[in-house]
Amino acid sequence: MVENVIWPAYFDAALSRRDGRRVPMELAVEEPSIDEIATAVQQVGYDAVVERDVAYPRRHWDAAGRVLVKDADDAKNTLVQAVAAYVGALRD
């Protein structure tokens, strides 16, 4: 079973690529929540499991949580880009 981990830092417009952002600034949002990300993952068509009390290793002081994506067929980068597009659409 393939399990991808998606951290809110991947979509945070306040972070640089060096600090963990994985999407272009055009797709990034301010302070993404794991609930928004989980909703976007479900919109893309995958099952999402939210873990709230874990911290992204590069930001170990900020336990923002993470979203686990079960059985994703796509490459992780493709999945992250699709989720970023939906998170942006949810904000509009």
UniProtKB/Swiss-Prot annotation:
A Pfam family that the UniProt record links to this protein: SRP19
InterPro entries: Signal_recog_particle_SRP19, SRP19, SRP19-like_sf, SRP19_arc-type
GO cellular component: signal recognition particle
Subcellular location: Cytoplasm
Keywords linked to the UniProt accession: Cytoplasm, Ribonucleoprotein, RNA-binding, Signal recognition particle
GO biological process: SRP-dependent cotranslational protein targeting to membrane, signal sequence recognition
Top-level taxon of the source organism: Archaea
Gene3D superfamilies xrefs: Signal recognition particle, SRP19-like subunit (3.30.56.30)
GO molecular function: 7S RNA binding
Subunit structure: Part of the signal recognition particle protein translocation system, which is composed of SRP and FtsY. Archaeal SRP consists of a 7S RNA molecule of 300 nucleotides and two protein subunits: SRP54 and SRP19.
Similarity annotation: Belongs to the SRP19 family.
Alphabetical list of PANTHER family matching this protein: SIGNAL RECOGNITION PARTICLE 19 KD PROTEIN, SIGNAL RECOGNITION PARTICLE 19 KDA PROTEIN
Purpose of the protein: Involved in targeting and insertion of nascent membrane proteins into the cytoplasmic membrane. Binds directly to 7S RNA and mediates binding of the 54 kDa subunit of the SRP.
Designated name of the protein: Signal recognition particle 19 kDa protein
Organism the protein comes from: Halobacterium salinarum (strain ATCC 700922 / JCM 11081 / NRC-1)
Lineage, broadest ranks: Archaea, Methanobacteriati, Methanobacteriota, Stenosarchaea group, Halobacteria
